[in-house]
């Protein structure tokens, strides 16, 4: 890791349809091989499907899903005197959001619906209702942190 310069954070523009920065970050995470228009159509298609099924505003469903997925604590490895301990640490807000987005996309890609729009729609609705594999990932992370609470005094 270079000690000379820290890469500065880039400004991102809010998405054109909802004017939300988090939706733009989500689109950028969905995007593969620089194909932004494909990512846009996937996200907006999933949002339209959520709106038609739940009769709710899709952005509020999206934000509640992210809140249900985002972890509060995680474990980090810390080496102390030849032993490696899994130390529970609090998660910074930016990392919480990034992990929630990453886990939501990974869970959607693992689902077995035919199109990515359907997978994403299903995972968003499941996560908003505290179900689904993305929420399970968060629960597992919290369980790991809870099981290793004895090592929390090694926190740095």
Curated annotation (Swiss-Prot):
Q: Does the keyword Mitochondrion apply?
A: no
Q: Which GO molecular function annotations are given, in alphabetical order?
A: rRNA binding; structural constituent of ribosome; tRNA binding
Q: Which InterPro entries match?
A: Ribosomal_uS7 (IPR000235), Ribosomal_uS7_bac/org-type (IPR005717), Ribosomal_uS7_CS (IPR020606), Ribosomal_uS7_dom (IPR023798), Ribosomal_uS7_dom_sf (IPR036823)
Q: Name one GO cellular component term.
A: small ribosomal subunit
PROSITE patterns, from UniProt? RIBOSOMAL_S7
The entry's keywords: Ribonucleoprotein, Ribosomal protein, RNA-binding, rRNA-binding, tRNA-binding
- From the UniProt record, give one GO term of the biological process aspect: translation
Fill in the subunit field for this protein.
Answer: Part of the 30S ribosomal subunit. Contacts proteins S9 and S11.
In the record, the note on similarity to other proteins reads:
Belongs to the universal ribosomal protein uS7 family.
Question: What is the documented function of this protein?
Answer: One of the primary rRNA binding proteins, it binds directly to 16S rRNA where it nucleates assembly of the head domain of the 30S subunit. Is located at the subunit interface close to the decoding center, probably blocks exit of the E-site tRNA.
**Name of the protein in its database record:** Small ribosomal subunit protein uS7
- Where is the organism placed in the taxonomic lineage, from the top? Bacteria, Pseudomonadati, Pseudomonadota, Alphaproteobacteria, Hyphomicrobiales
């Amino acid at each position: 890791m270079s000690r000379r310069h820290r890469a500065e954070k880039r400004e991102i523009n809010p998405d054109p349809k909802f004017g939300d920065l988090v939706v733009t970050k989500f689109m950028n995470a969905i995007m593969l091989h620089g194909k932004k228009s494909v990512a846009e159509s996937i996200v907006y298609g999933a949002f339209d499907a959520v709106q038609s099924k739940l009769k709710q505003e899709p952005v509020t469903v999206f934000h509640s899903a992210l809140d249900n997925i985002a972890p509060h604590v995680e474990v980090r490895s810390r080496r102390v005197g030849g032993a490696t301990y899994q130390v529970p640490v609090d998660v910074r807000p930016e990392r919480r959001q990034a992990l929630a987005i990453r886990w939501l996309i990974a869970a959607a890609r693992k689902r077995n619906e035919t199109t990515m729009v359907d997978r994403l729609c299903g995972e968003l609705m499941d996560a908003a209702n505290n179900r689904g594999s993305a929420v399970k990932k968060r629960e597992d992370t919290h369980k790991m942190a809870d099981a290793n609470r004895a090592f929390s005094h090694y926190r740095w």
